[in-house]
Every structure is written in C-alpha cells, then in structure tokens.
Design a protein with these regions (language model features):
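Transmembrane alpha-helix boundary signature
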Residues: 29-33, 79-80, 98-120, 132-147, ...
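Alpha-helical transmembrane segments
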Residues: 116-128, 226-244, 373-392, 484-487, ...
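Membrane-interfacial helix-loop connectors
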Residues: 100-101, 162, 173-187, 191-193, ...
Length: 584
C-alpha cells in the first residue's frame, strides 16, 4: 500500500475511534455524575483532585492500547508512513482520548492531563534530554573491533555504570562506541538487544539514580542505599545474561567474514570528557532537589497537622487486618472468595483501610511540598529547581561541545555537513536529535493515553482491575511476593514502570519502614519486577527506545515491537523464572 493510501486508512480509523470515544465516555460520565465523590471519597483513592478510578470503565484504556498497537504494527505494515508521521499518530491518539475525556469529565479530566504532563512527562523528558545531550558529547576514538570479548566488556562496563549515572546516561554513553566497533559486522542485532537488556534496564538496579521507579521509592522514604539489597539478585542475572551473550556472539562472530583492514591501529582516547562532569552535575541536581524538598521547600506544619489523622487511619487499618486474620483462622473450612460475602467484606474493608492510609500520606506529601499552582496542579519548587538546573547543564554541554551544521540527504534525513566529522566532536560521534525527538513525541501520547489504566489500578479493589490487586494478596491480604514480582514486571513492560512501582508499593501498605523491614522481600520483588522487566519491550523503559533509534540511525535493522519481544521472551522469561524460584 502506498504512503498516501495509508494516510487515508489512518484518517478513517481516527474518525471511527473518535466518534466511539465521544459517545462512550459521554455516556459513562453522565452515568457517574449523580454519584460523583471524587473530592471526598472515603476510601482515600483521591487525595485532592482528579478522577476516581473506581468509576472508569475498562474500555477507557482502548486509546492506550491503540497507541501501543500503532507502535507495534505500523513499522511492520507501513514503515515509510510511520517514520514520516509517528508524531502525528501520537497526536491523533491524544486527540482521540483527550477531547472525549474532557467532554465527559471536564475539570477532573483537565486536572489529570495537566498533572501527568507537568509532574511526570516534563521531568521525564527533561532528564532524558539532559543525559542524552551530555553523553552525546563524549566520543571514544581509536581502533575498537567488535569481537565477542570486546562487546561483552563494553556491555559489562555499561551494566556497572547504569546504577550510578542512570540507565539513560550509561546507554547514551556507550551505545555509539559499541555500534562503531561492530559497524563492519553483518550479524549485530543481538548486540544491541543484549545492550538494552543489561545497560538500559537491569544495570540500573542498585541505587535510586539508576532507574525512575527506585527514585520514586527514595522519594517515598526508602533509604538511598537500601536498593543495594538488589545486588544479590542483579549480579547473578547480569552474569548469566553476559555468559549467554558471549556464547551467542561467539557463534555469530564465526559467521562473519574477515574483518576489514583499518590500517594503522589507533590508540583509544576520550574526547569531550568534561561532559562526565556535566553528567555528575545532573545527578547532583536530582539529589539537591530532594534535599530542598525535605528542607527549604517543605512546610513543616503539615506533618504535625496530619499526624493524628494518619495514626488514626493506621489504627483502623491494623484493626481491619486483625478482623480478617481472625475470621480466616477460625473458619478454615469456609470458602475464601467472593462467594463468601462476610469474608469478602472483611477483606475489602482492610484494603479500603490501606487505601485510606495511602491517601492521607499522599495528601500530606502534596500539602507539605511548597510549590506553584499551574492550572490547578501543584508543581513543587524543588521540581522547578531540578528541571531548571538540568536544562542549564544541557545548554552548557552544548556550548562546550557544540552542534554541527546539518543538511538533508536524498531521503530527507538530517545529516552532518560534508567533512563535519573531522572538525566537530558531536558529528564524529554520530549525534543527532532524532532519537530524543522520537521518544518525546511518542511518550507524550503514551503518558496521556495511559491515564485511565493508571487510575483504574490506583482504585485498587474498587477498580475494574481489582483482580490484579487481589492476585498479589493471600486470603489474609498478606503479600504474595512471587505475584508482586511478576505483576509489577508485566505491567511495567507496557505501562510506565515508575507509576506502576508506586501502585504496587502502595498496595503493599506504602509504609517505607515496614517495607524495608519485615516486608523487605516484598519491596525487593516490586523493585526487581519494575526494573528488570522494563527490558521486556521497547516501551518498558525510555532508554530502550532511544537505543533502538540510535542503532537504526547507524544502519542496524532493529526488530519490530513484536520482533523485539521474540528476543526478550525466550531469553529473559526463563531467567525471571529462575529468579522467582531462588528469591521469591
């Protein structure tokens, strides 16, 4: 099918989805209007504003499924159309979702969209852009031949660095040298795939700097170095995958012809090394903003005011748990499912009590963070300082290692001017803005369209995905760590892994002291699931997509969305099953 024909097909699909969305969301909103309790819901799902996920029907996640399917299918069936129009496709799904959503839920819908853009998407893309810019100004020059040993060493170094400079920083630093080292090889897709597995995901397990889910845990009170407890899991997983990679790369290497003669061997050297300092400054900005949030930009009176309410709610939560446990222990022969009304009521009472405590904790965090209200959303001053510093650092990096002049080639691609690589470090490094632009355009659609899925999950036992919440709990609502690991991981593969982590963190009680203490295995399961299984898909973690885009820029024919999963499932799932048997 020609490009213009695909445009017409897409327009038809767009209008069909738009019409259906307007009708269905409007009907649902009218249905819910009579019993709207979003601001005063006594289960604590909504701490201040926004939509109660318990009232959202499951079909509202269709636009989210639509944008994921677009990412998966269009590159397969309409590759040229996709590369020319992926930003428009993302925008189309935003419109399909947002306009009916706003018509149906009005102010609450507006709040949710602005909230996820200002507090999730903007920090997300600012951090990625800053790391992308700084790392793109570091160029490893010299003779580097992509043998199995060299490739394994590069991936191992990246895996080690990822926890300390972030998965994005480590991936952006090393992907270009790795691609240049293997440019002469025909069989190199697997090199990039394993790089995504290890450097862009699993390597970021050991500190809150490594991956966004762990940083959110840090913001919720998990100690900075607690995440080192993931080391006994991360190390054997990394070693096992490196061994598998080395064996596979050795087999592929034997299929290659003789390596080309590059002439006189050049010693390795790093240009633009000052950008390492800029990357360190980005990490420093993150930690500095946390100290500001805990100090100068914190209203200390809020904790004192909220303490009695939180203590009362925690007492009610403990009492509800005791009642549930007592019933289960004294009714061992009873059916412990929804068919037993008394049992199910006790179980949901406890889960509602947990949600109420989490709601009060969220309200406390919201109220004590001093900030500026933008369209009704409180943006903490600490966030503004952090993002402002990172933007400034990115600008300084561009001043130190400036961009080159570009031209368009015969295919419309932006490329460096002729001979630019000889005089410009970023040109020599193959640096372009296209990978970060692709992530920015696609992920704004993903973030906005996933609002219903996140709200339904946050609604817990009252939401249409209540079975997910119940699946991680035993009959007495004690955690089932195996299920926490797998469900956090599976959802993190398709949703943003940071809010998914928070959903299950709160489902497990949301108390960092308890989760670092007697429930440490549960927190370990949630953390491993969120970080490790981000490697399952291209959208599981943002660096995955950026690495894919850079590889394609360098002539590597990367697998499609489903093609990538054809690698990740047979390689990673057996490893995760082994992790389950050994640790959870």
């Amino acid at each position: 099918m020609r490009n213009y024909e695909w445009v017409n097909v897409f327009r038809f699909i767009f209008f069909i989805f738009f019409a259906l969305s307007v009708s269905l969301i409007s009907i649902t909103a009218v249905d819910a209007a009579g019993s709207k309790e979003a601001d005063t819901h006594d289960h604590g799902h909504s701490s201040h504003h926004g939509i109660d996920g318990a009232k959202l029907p499951l079909w509202t996640i269709i636009p989210f499924a639509g944008i994921l399917l677009s990412i998966a299918v269009f590159p397969l069936v309409a590759e040229h159309f996709w590369h020319q129009n992926y930003g428009k496709v993302s925008l189309a799904w935003i419109v399909i979702f947002s306009i009916p959503f706003l018509i149906g839920y009005r102010g609450d819908a507006w709040y949710e969209i602005v909230h996820i853009v200002l507090l999730d998407y903007v920090p997300f893309i600012v951090l990625l852009s800053a790391l992308f810019t700084a790392a793109g100004g570091i160029c490893l020059k010299g003779s580097l031949r992509g043998s199995p040993a060299v490739n394994t060493i590069i991936i191992a170094i990246g895996t080690s660095l990822a926890s300390w400079m972030g998965t994005t920083g480590a991936a952006m630093l090393l992907i270009r040298p790795l691609l240049r080292a293997n440019a002469w090889r025909k069989h190199k897709v697997h090199v990039v795939v394993f790089f995504i597995f290890l450097v862009a995901n699993i390597g970021g397990s050991l500190t809150p700097l490594g991956d966004p889910p762990l940083f959110l845990g840090f913001l919720k009170g998990v100690e900075f170095f607690w995440t080192l407890k993931l080391f006994p899991v991360m190390l054997p997983v990394s070693i096992l995958l490196l061994i598998v990679f080395f064996v596979f790369d050795t087999l592929m290497f034997k299929k290659e012809g003789a390596a080309p003669d590059d002439g006189e061997k050049q010693p390795l050297k790093l240009d633009g090394a000052l950008n390492f300092v800029f990357i360190a400054c980005i990490i420093g900005a993150i930690l500095f903003s946390k100290s500001l949030a805990d100090g100068a930009f914190k209203d200390e009176t809020v904790a004192e005011k909220m303490a009695p309410k939180i203590q009362k709610a925690e007492g009610e939560m403990a009492a509800a748990k005791d009642k549930l446990s007592a019933y289960v222990s004294s009714n061992s022969g009873a059916s412990l499912d929804q068919s037993n009304a008394e049992y199910y009521q006790l179980r949901t009472d406890h889960l509602h009590a947990v949600a109420a405590v989490n709601g009060l904790r969220a309200k406390k965090t919201h109220d004590e963070n001093l900030g500026v209200d933008i369209f009704g959303v409180r943006v903490p001053y600490a966030n503004l300082v952090r993002d402002g510093l990172m933007i400034l650092i990115g600008i300084v990096s561009l001043i130190y290692t400036p961009m080159y002049r570009t031209v368009k080639d015969d295919h419309g691609h932006v490329v460096p001017e002729e001979n630019a690589a000889e005089t410009n470090l970023r040109a020599a490094n193959g640096f372009t803005w296209e990978p970060i632009l692709e992530v920015a355009k696609l992920f704004i659609g993903i973030f906005i369209c996933m609002i219903p899925a996140l709200k339904i999950l946050q609604a817990g036992v009252d939401g249409k995905l209540s079975n997910v919440v119940l699946a991680v709990q035993s009959s007495t609502n004690d955690p089932i760590n195996t299920m926490y690991f797998w469900l956090t991981g599976i959802l993190s593969s398709f949703l943003d892994n940071a809010p998914t982590y928070v959903v299950f963190f709160n489902t497990a009680g949301g108390d960092p002291t308890s989760l670092m203490g007697p429930m440490s295995q549960t927190l370990l399961a949630i953390s491993c699931g969120a970080v490790f299984m981000g490697a399952n898909t291209y959208i599981g973690n943002a660096p995955n997509f950026m690495v894919k885009a850079i590889a394609e820029e360098n002539g590597v024919k990367m697998p499609s969305f489903f093609g990538y999963m054809a690698w990740s499932i047979p390689i990673l799932v057996p490893v995760f099953i082994l992790v389950t048997l050994l640790y959870f």
